[in-house]
Amino acid sequence: MPVDDTLIAFASRLADTSGAVIRPLFRQRIDVAHKQGRHDFDPVTEADKGAERAIRDLLRRERPDDAILGEEYGAQAGTSGYRWILDPVDGTRAFITGRHEWGSLIALEKDGAPVLGLLDQPVLGERFIGVNGAAHLIQAGRSQKLEVRACASLSEAVLCATDPRAYFTNEQVAAVDRVARGVKMTRYGGD
């Protein structure tokens, strides 16, 4: 289902709203709490919670019939068939250590099918949007279409991912390692 320009612009407004909350907190002394019952250490900060609250407030005002699923505050039902999925600070460990490997994730579903994905890196001024079968990097007001590199074989591939040792079982790590041995280059990082 094609997504119209109004929804694309609104998703960008949600990212702007999130970034306005998060940017002043990056590389500042902020409290870090632990979300109980998730992982050994699953940090959450006021940046995570404040940004999600700000996004939810904007959604309630302008799209009150849409459902919401957020990392920090869970699910809110809707009646429009649209559902916004939010993780305002994906990579909280990187965020609290002052590294740039984090971003705000905003996705939109229509009747259970994904129709838009947005990654905003507000301190770097980079925004990635995937919608209507295309992906773009928006930076300094300019849009650049993104495409995957041509890759005829696994030995030409570059594998970039979160460090599998952070979340995977030993069996899953071994599977990733088998793939990694066959690629041209591997880069792990972030959380």
What are these regions (language model features)?
Residues 1-89, 174:
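N-terminal subdomain of lithium-sensitive/metallo-dependent phosphomonoesterases centered on the IMPase/IPPase/PAP
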